[in-house]
Amino acid sequence: MSGENRFPEELLLNEPDRGHRLIREFYENYADIARTPDYYTAIRGQHEKIKTTFYRRWLERNAHDQRSLGLDVGCRGGVLAGMIGLIRWIGVDIDDAALEVAREAGLPCVEMDFTTAINFQNASFDVVMTNEVLEHLPYPAITVREVHRILKKNPGSAYVGSVPLDYHLHRRWKVMRGKRLSGEQLHVHHFSFKELDQLLRFYFNNVEYLPLSGTAQRHPRWRLSYNLFVRDIAWAAASPKSEPGRWNVRERF
C-alpha cells in the first residue's frame, strides 16, 4: 500500500475506557457534591414517595419477598431501593461518588457503564428498576431489550421505572416558541407516551402506568390522553415474553 493511501494509525488514541471515563466525569461534574452534598440522598418532591409505594404494591402483588433479587440500574445513592425494600436489591451506576453513598446506605453495588449493555448473565434477576434512567441513554430500545434479557422469564418477574414525557402540550408549545423540549442537558432521549408504551408492551405481557404529574394526573376522571396531558410517568411491567422477536428500529412515533 502506498504511503498516500495508508491510514495514519499512529494518530489513534490507545485509551479503551476513555468514553466510560468521560461520561463518569460528566455526571460527577453535574452532581458537584461540594456544592450540593445531599445530591445523592435528597428526596425532592413527592414523586419518589408515590413511585416507591406504587412499585412496592406491584411487587407484593406478584409475590416478591426477600427471596427475590432486584437490580437497580442507575442506583445513585441507593435511596429508592431502600425505600422500596421488600426484596434483596443490588445496584449499578457509572458515578463513583454515588456508589460510595449507596454502599454507606447498605446497598451492594458496583460501577458499570450501561449506556449500551447491562453486563449480567441471562435470567439473573426477579426485578429490574430503571428510575429516571432511560431518558439519559441514547438507545432506550437496546436498554429495555437488555432488561428483558437479564430478567427471569416468570409471570411475576417485574420491570419498574419512570421517565419524563416530553411531548405533552406544554412542551409542544415551548417548541413552537423556539425552545428545546427539555432544558436538561443530561436528557438525550425524549419520550412520547406512545413510544414508551409500545416499547414496554413489545417485551412484557402486563403493563400498568401511574401518571406522576400533568393534567391527567390531577384530574384522573377526565380520562385525558397520556400522550398530551402527562409530564412524568411511572410503570410496572410483568410477565416478560418468552420470545418477543425483534424490535422494529424503523418504527416512527
Residue ranges and their predicted role:
Residues M1-Q121, V127, A141-V144, G161, ...:
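Conserved N-terminal segment of class I S-adenosyl-L-methionine
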Residues G82-G85, R180-E184:
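Short glycine-enriched loop/turn motifs at secondary-structure junctions
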Residues V127-V133:
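A short beta-strand submotif of the Rossmann-like class I SAM-dependent methyltransferase core
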Residues Y139-P140, R172:
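Conserved catalytic-core motifs of eukaryotic protein kinase domains, centered on the activation segment
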Residues A141-S157:
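A short glycine-rich, Lys/Arg-flanked "PGG" loop and its adjoining helix->strand segment in the class I
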Residues A158-G183:
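Conserved class I S-adenosyl-L-methionine
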Residues H168, L186, F191:
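A conserved catalytic-core signature of glycosyltransferases
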